[in-house]
């Protein structure tokens, strides 16, 4: 994948763990409940991916967006993420791998406003989370504490 979006409680917590007993997979759909109680559902249309995240009550509601990770022979050459408004991000990832100049562009629309947006490049935080462009960008998006609300990307189900 060219973009990695993951639910997170806090940026320092690292990867969420899960048991295969808590997974469901079929063509075009995947669901898992992580050990931290976050339920994740992923689905697709012909042109986009749809994510649903349901967080435990009174927990932080956050996502990480990682454009730095490369798989197999792929090498990231440039990435960018920009906050368009309180619910929309746009960006791109350029890489070399199966194509010499592969470009993936994206728009992410949330069903809730972002309360905190922290950008990182080369694991150093940026002071201004409005736009990041670098060889490798990583974004932490915090939606604050909600009461068991579902965060959807995009908001239509």
Model-derived features with residue positions:
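Beta-sandwich/jelly-roll carbohydrate-recognition scaffolds of carbohydrate-active enzymes
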Residues: 1-157
């Amino acid at each position: 994948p060219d973009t990695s979006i993951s639910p997170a409680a806090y940026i320092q917590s690292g990867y969420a763990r899960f048991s295969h007993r808590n997974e469901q997979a079929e063509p075009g759909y995947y669901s898992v409940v992580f050990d931290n109680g976050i339920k994740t559902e992923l689905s697709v249309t012909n042109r986009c991916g749809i994510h649903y995240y349901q967080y435990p009550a009174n927990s932080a509601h956050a996502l990480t967006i990682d454009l730095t990770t490369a798989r197999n022979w792929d090498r990231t050459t440039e990435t960018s993420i920009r906050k368009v408004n309180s619910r929309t991000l746009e960006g791109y990832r350029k890489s070399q791998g199966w194509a010499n100049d592969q470009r993936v562009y994206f728009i992410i629309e949330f069903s809730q406003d972002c309360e905190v947006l922290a950008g990182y490049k080369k694991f150093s935080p940026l002071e201004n989370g409005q736009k990041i462009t670098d060889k490798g960008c990583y974004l932490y998006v915090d939606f604050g504490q909600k009461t068991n609300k579902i965060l959807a990307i995009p908001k239509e189900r």
